[in-house]
Amino acid sequence: MAAAVRQDLAQLMNSSGSHKDLAGKYRQILEKAIQLSGTEQLEALKAFVEAMVNENVSLVISRQLLTDFCTHLPNLPDSTAKEVYHFTLEKVQPRVISFEEQVASIRQRLASIYEKEEDWRNAAQVLVGIPLETGQKQYNVDYKLETYLKIARLYLEDDDPVQAEAYINRASLLQNESTNEQLQIHYKVCYARVLDYRRKFIEAAQRYNELSYKTIVHESERLEALKHALHCTILASAGQQRSRMLATLFKDERCQQLAAYGILEKMYLDRIIRGNQLQEFAAMLMPHQKATTADGSSILDRAVIEHNLLSASKLYNNITFEELGALLEIPAAKAEKIASQMITEGRMNGFIDQIDGIVHFETREALPTWDKQIQSLCFQVNNLLEKISQTAPEWTAQAMEAQMAQ
């Protein structure tokens, strides 16, 4: 039957008639090819593609018929459709400028098949082949933005944050031009994930936290974004930016619903965190967040050591490297190195006396510390009052009336 389709196509290519009549006859042949099955169907469809890209066929007809052809293929088995898509892209390549719209459609559909198969890299690379900026066709902003975001997301799924960042940067140039709110949200999610994968944790936390307030996002997804914001903040390097983010999250009552709230509370209140308190939190982290740093420690270990060092700087005026190492549960030399790095980067105030083996912490102002402690106490008292009100609303109402009457 494939041979019959090929013969019909050869006869039609040598015949004359109006575009409308010829297009109708080609559609009949396409329908006949679609009705076949197995190898016969595959060969017939390939023959149809070869006919469409032949220069003897009018470009008006071939573009129209290739568009129709693309609408039929999703109904075929994925294995057949994939082979036909690849064959079509190969045959169209010499005349790709003439069939840009059809090629873009084929690449989108082929990428969907690869995505379904969880072949993320091939899906991304197929979409990269769409000439969004260099082609003859003018693509609208939303189409380009959506495609770049899809490529970035696919590279993230393939654990390639470098390529993902390259395409999210291209999307960044377009997102201000788009009025599609859904695409704007997708951009923010993807950008936050790229920052997260690239270990730019404080920037990722800020983006995730921003998403957690977007009313267009479903409530469960907002809470998920808040959870990611909290995890990224805990993993971020100690310093002023992280302290500000910890304060923002600690004041957000929604964080009390999250499993990692206990760690957040300890970090915000500058308490020393012990290694055995981290096991439950470590199990919640995503694979890329469990990576090790250059010195062999995990990202979480490094973040907690820096936090504990900053907490120690608020407890002591000075401390020897040996004592500091014991406090941080790490070798003295490593404690010295981390303290030196934090002081050099301006993330901790102090200086190191290497002759005596002591790190000196510069005295902090008492007033801001008192303010922070009072603020924390008020916050906790407010939480207690809310819980009492929920448990015993009638008693709370009577107590309030009695207070007002005094």
From Swiss-Prot:
The keyword Membrane does not apply. It is found in: Cytoplasm; Nucleus; Cytoplasmic vesicle, Secretory vesicle, Synaptic vesicle. Keywords: Acetylation, Cytoplasm, Cytoplasmic vesicle, Nucleus, Signalosome, Synapse. Its main location: cytoplasm. One of its GO terms (cellular component) is nucleus. PROSITE patterns: PCI (PS50250). The keyword Acetylation applies. One of its GO terms (biological process) is protein deneddylation. The modification N6-acetyllysine is found at residue 25. The modification N-acetylalanine is found at residue 2. Pfam families: CSN4_RPN5_eIF3a (PF18420), PCI (PF01399), PSMD12-CSN4_N (PF22241). Residues 197-366 form the PCI domain. Component of the CSN complex, composed of COPS1/GPS1, COPS2, COPS3, COPS4, COPS5, COPS6, COPS7 (COPS7A or COPS7B), COPS8 and COPS9. In the complex, it probably interacts directly with COPS1, COPS2, COPS3, COPS5, COPS6, COPS7 (COPS7A or COPS7B) and COPS8. Interacts with TOR1A; the interaction is direct and associates TOR1A and SNAPIN with the CSN complex. Interacts with STON2; controls STON2 neddylation levels. Interacts with ERCC6. Component of the COP9 signalosome complex (CSN), a complex involved in various cellular and developmental processes. The CSN complex is an essential regulator of the ubiquitin (Ubl) conjugation pathway by mediating the deneddylation of the cullin subunits of SCF-type E3 ligase complexes, leading to decrease the Ubl ligase activity of SCF-type complexes such as SCF, CSA or DDB2. Also involved in the deneddylation of non-cullin subunits such as STON2. PANTHER family: 26S PROTEASOME NON-ATPASE REGULATORY SUBUNIT 12/COP9 SIGNALOSOME COMPLEX SUBUNIT 4, COP9 SIGNALOSOME COMPLEX SUBUNIT 4. Belongs to the CSN4 family. This is COP9 signalosome complex subunit 4. The gene is Cops4.
